[in-house]
Structures are given as C-alpha cells and as structure tokens.
C-alpha cells in the first residue's frame, strides 16, 4: 500500500514539474506562431547581435560610415546653393525657407478619436476569477471594453483577457 501511494506522489510531482517547466520556459513553440529571438546577456559582455559581419556585406562604396545623414536636411538646399533645372524663384521668397513646413503637427495629438476609443469603459465590474491557467503570457481576445460587443466588458478571464458579461 505504501509503495503504491509513493508511486502516485512521484507521478503527480513529475506532472506538476513538467507543467511548471513548460509554463516558465516555453521550451517548444509551433513554427511561425509568435516565435521571437531573445538575446541573452552574460555578465561583463554585450549583446552578440551585430558583432560579426556576414561575408559579402560591407559598407556601400562611396558612403561615409562616420557621418549619418538626416533625411530632412538632405532634401533642403544650402543657403548659397543655386536652384536646380526647371525650378523658378519666387520674388521676395528665400528658396531655403520655401521648402520648410509652416506648422508642425504633433502626431499623438492628431488622433484624439483613437485615444477616446481606447479609454472608453462600459458600466459594471468584471466577474471574479477563482482559477487561472498556468500559461506565462496567455493570449488576449480583447484589450479594451470598446472591442467587446453590446454590454460586455473586456475582463481578465481564466486564461487571458476576454469579453464577459459584467456583474
């Protein structure tokens, strides 16, 4: 009787250990489904990426590696530079200032509708979840209440976020 219960305990511990190892390490993943390469840093060493050149890959001929070009500045003519062929000068206008934009628009402030959509919360509270899955990073079916149909809310569920009926 004792040996049988001992074997049952050993099997239970092996199964639990396997589940924890899979959840913590994610040893194998299906090809093409969210696989990411992770750089491991060793104490005293930098990341390995980009140290060795691949054969046949070198700097482009005629390109200076020390100086980086700003794409905006590269398009603007110098103040003393003449206009190119086919370009007419406007009287009283400096050709250098003519190519600068009048007003710069902040891309974050240009999208207030999206910001309001994400922050929209529906009334009610999420149901309490008693049991959770063991996945380290479970997949989410929604990110905000706005993505859920009707009165449903985006809540933390059994395994990741999902649309649920509120309390």
UniProtKB/Swiss-Prot annotation:
Residues 1-21 form the signal peptide. Residues 78-126 are annotated as: 2 X tandem repeats of SVP-1 like motif. Residues 22-70 form a propeptide. Residues 46-104 are annotated as: Disordered. Keywords: Disulfide bond, Protease inhibitor, Repeat, Serine protease inhibitor, Signal. Residues 44-115 are annotated as: 12 X 6 AA tandem repeats of [GSAL]-[QEK]-[DGLP]-[APSLQ]-[VGDFI]-[KR]. Trachea and large intestine. One of its GO terms (biological process) is antibacterial humoral response. Residues 119-167 form the WAP domain. Pfam families: Cementoin, WAP. SUPFAM superfamilies: Elafin-like. SMART domains: WAP (SM00217). Residues 79-91 have a biased composition (Basic and acidic residues). GO terms for molecular function: serine-type endopeptidase inhibitor activity. CDD domains: WAP. The keyword Repeat applies. This is Elafin. It comes from Sus scrofa (Pig).
């Amino acid at each position: 009787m004792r040996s049988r219960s001992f074997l049952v305990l050993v099997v239970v511990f092996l199964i639990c250990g396997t589940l924890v190892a899979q959840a913590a390490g994610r040893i194998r993943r299906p090809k093409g489904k969210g696989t990411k390469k992770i750089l491991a840093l060793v104490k005293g060493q930098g990341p390995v990426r980009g140290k060795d050149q691949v054969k046949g890959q070198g700097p482009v001929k005629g390109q200076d590696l020390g100086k980086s070009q700003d794409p905006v500045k590269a398009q603007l003519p110098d103040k003393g530079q003449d206009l190119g062929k086919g370009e007419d000068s406007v009287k009283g206008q400096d050709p250098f200032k003519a190519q600068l934009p009048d007003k710069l628009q902040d891309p974050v402030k240009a999208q207030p509708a999206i910001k309001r959509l994400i922050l929209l919360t529906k009334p009610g509270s999420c149901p309490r979840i008693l049991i959770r899955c063991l996945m380290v990073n479970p997949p989410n079916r929604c990110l905000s209440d706005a993505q859920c149909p009707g009165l449903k809310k985006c809540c933390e569920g059994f395994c990741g976020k999902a649309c649920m009926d509120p309390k």
